[in-house]
């Protein structure tokens, strides 16, 4: 069975790249024949070693560097091209070039586009994968999801740990668990162990909402009983985020125990960076993290890394598995004490972390993701 991944998102950080890799490799493992449907001149960040079909309609439209008026124009152009891509995907399905189409990172806007394209009448199943629905977008999602009920081959899958749609009785929506992100070389996955210095990692796409200054101040105030090294990596998409990250690099340049990496980490370099630390810190403060599954959290699980995270990040996981702690963000003093406790008790808690991470990896396996999408 040929399964087409209709991808049109280009991002600087690694999780979109990694999610597509999970799909491609997972589909192959379970006996499917995956391929990509992508816009013309699509800039792949990774060689997935799989077939590629290009979609007519123009190249991907980026908002990078666009002012207010320019962004409005690009938004219009993006929608126009998305309709064209969907129409061409429909043609390819009619021609028998695939048996299933998966749109791996959808929003309600994709369903609006679908309604204006031929793809809604697809002769093969078209599976839209959503990575969470914010409350302020829920009604828009429901509106377009209900319209899709008229088209039996349109399937909607929401990756979530919540159940916010029980009362809405949508017949075409399934809620599925998130997958862990794992190293390419599974032999490199090690149990949690004691190392000196204990390395803490702050990774991912940096946005100013991620409380980095609050965390750095707490880190330099904390008194640890073991040597500690902090790695702070930031991939930045917007100029204002890049400037903020550079500012932190200058402010904390005198602290030898803090190492900054202002660059994207893709593929092997990303995996090696994650494997090099003992624990992952996620002091991200934004309410939307309750509704969208955290790729960084599920990377930590897949790489067997205990974590310290803000309470907004998928709290359902820590309620099930003792793989770390939810941070007390009420004051810097409370944060400092918790950071000290986490680091100073880390060695003692290693057996607990290993058992919980093992169970979490089973529940949130990549194999389960593929089964849930294709079911």
Identify the function of each model-found stretch.
Residues 29-78, 108, 235-241:
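N-terminal strand-loop element at the rim of the active site
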Residues 7-21, 44, 207-210:
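A short, glycine/small-residue-rich beta-strand->loop->alpha-helix junction that serves as a flexible
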């Amino acid at each position: 069975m040929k399964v087409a991944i209709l991808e049109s998102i280009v991002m600087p950080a690694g999780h979109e790249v990694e999610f597509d890799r999970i799909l491609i490799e997972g589909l192959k493992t379970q006996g499917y024949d995956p391929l990509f449907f992508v816009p013309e001149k699509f800039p792949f960040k990774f060689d997935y070693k799989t077939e590629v079909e290009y979609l007519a309609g123009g190249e991907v439209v980026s908002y990078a560097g666009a002012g207010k008026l320019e962004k409005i124009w690009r938004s219009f152009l993006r929608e126009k091209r998305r309709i064209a891509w969907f129409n061409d995907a429909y043609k390819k399905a009619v021609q028998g070039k695939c048996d299933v189409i998966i749109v791996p990172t959808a929003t309600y806007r994709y369903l609006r586009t679908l309604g204006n394209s031929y793809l809604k009448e697809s002769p093969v199943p078209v599976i839209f994968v959503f990575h969470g629905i914010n409350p302020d977008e829920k009604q828009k999602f429901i509106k377009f999801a209900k319209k899709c009920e008229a088209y039996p081959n349109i399937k909607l899958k929401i990756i979530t740990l919540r159940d916010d749609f029980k009362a809405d009785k949508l017949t075409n929506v399934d809620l599925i668990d998130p997958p862990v992100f794992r190293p390419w070389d599974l032999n490199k996955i090690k149990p949690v162990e004691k190392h000196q210095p204990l390395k803490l990692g702050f990774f991912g796409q940096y946005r100013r909402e991620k409380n980095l200054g609050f965390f750095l101040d707490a880190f330099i105030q904390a008194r640890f009983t073991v040597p500690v090294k902090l790695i702070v990596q930031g991939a930045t998409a917007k100029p204002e985020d890049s400037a903020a990250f550079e500012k932190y690099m200058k402010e904390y340049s005198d602290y030898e125990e803090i190492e900054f990496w202002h660059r994207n980490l893709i593929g092997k370099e990303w995996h090696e960076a994650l494997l090099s630390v003992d624990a992952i810190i996620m002091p991200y403060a934004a309410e939307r993290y309750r509704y969208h599954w955290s790729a960084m959290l599920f990377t930590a699980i897949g790489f067997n890394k205990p974590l310290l995270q803000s309470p907004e990040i998928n709290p359902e996981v820590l309620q099930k598995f003792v793989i770390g702690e939810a941070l007390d963000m009420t004051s810097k003093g409370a944060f400092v004490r918790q950071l000290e406790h986490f680091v100073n008790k880390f060695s003692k808690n290693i057996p607990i972390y290993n058992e919980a991470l093992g169970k979490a990896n089973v529940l949130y396996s990549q194999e389960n993701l593929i089964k849930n999408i294709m079911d």
